[in-house]
Amino acid sequence: MSLLTEVETYVLSIIPSGPLKAEIAQRLEDVFAGKNTDLEALMEWLKTRPILSPLTKGILGFVFTLTVPSERGLQRRRFVQNALNGNGDPNNMDRAVKLYRKLKREITFHGAKEVALSYSTGALASCMGLIYNRMGTVTTEVAFGLVCATCEQIADSQHRSHRQMVTTTNPLIRHENRMVLASTTAKAMEQMAGSSEQAAEAMEVASQARQMVHAMRTIGTHPSSSAGLKDDLLENLQAYQKRMGVQIQRFK
């Protein structure tokens, strides 16, 4: 796996699924391929994206700044600086300085990532802030190691939280989670269906599912009533894809 592929993988792992993730993936690909060279426009676009947390925007801004060639005097962006200040905690800043000194001695991506993984997310963000604000310099490879270590920590905590939700025994949370998944699956079906004649059936199924979820939420239903809703939808979607000659088995 090439370095940039690895960076793209780690960065995308912390972004919630949805159309925005697909858009960000495209921007990252363009930036890494040298197709997007207007850093100012890129940062303005990033700043106004909804849904993303300030830290995620800060990390993306840092990656764009590292990758896109820019004039020496180009202003640093406040939204990135604020996201990478370690919540203003002096402890984070102290640890970030210690980490920075260690990173100065590293020359490889993996070496830097290994060193960085033993620090807290706050310290890692502060260290990125130091480099972003030009208070310290490391090689691009080392900076990317720092980025990936930060993303790995964030993805780990997201995964733990997701696992807790999936394995919860609380029937109300499980019920709501099934309805949310059914709703997003229906949305994906509508987007994939396009405008062909065979698509009408898939669109109908998706529309009915969304109406059903809407009704269940409106009148309030027994927590077990949503069981199998998403699986039924996926079966319909896969049957539709088979007829269309498309084989995508990755939704489950």
Swiss-Prot record:
Residues 165-252 are annotated as: RNP-binding. GO terms for cellular component: host cell nucleus; membrane; virion membrane. Residues 1-164 are annotated as: Membrane-binding. The keyword Cytoplasm does not apply. A motif (Nuclear localization signal) lies at residues 101-105. It comes from the Viruses. Coiled coil: none annotated. GO terms for biological process: viral budding from plasma membrane. Keywords: Host nucleus, Membrane, RNA-binding, Viral matrix protein, Virion. Pfam families: Flu_M1 (PF00598), Flu_M1_C (PF08289). Plays critical roles in virus replication, from virus entry and uncoating to assembly and budding of the virus particle. M1 binding to ribonucleocapsids (RNPs) in nucleus seems to inhibit viral transcription. Interaction of viral NEP with M1-RNP is thought to promote nuclear export of the complex, which is targeted to the virion assembly site at the apical plasma membrane in polarized epithelial cells. Interactions with NA and HA may bring M1, a non-raft-associated protein, into lipid rafts. Forms a continuous shell on the inner side of the lipid bilayer in virion, where it binds the RNP. Determines the virion's shape: spherical or filamentous. Clinical isolates of influenza are characterized by the presence of significant proportion of filamentous virions, whereas after multiple passage on eggs or cell culture, virions have only spherical morphology. Filamentous virions are thought to be important to infect neighboring cells, and spherical virions more suited to spread through aerosol between hosts organisms. This is Matrix protein 1. It comes from Influenza A virus (strain A/Swine/Netherlands/12/1985 H1N1). The gene is M.
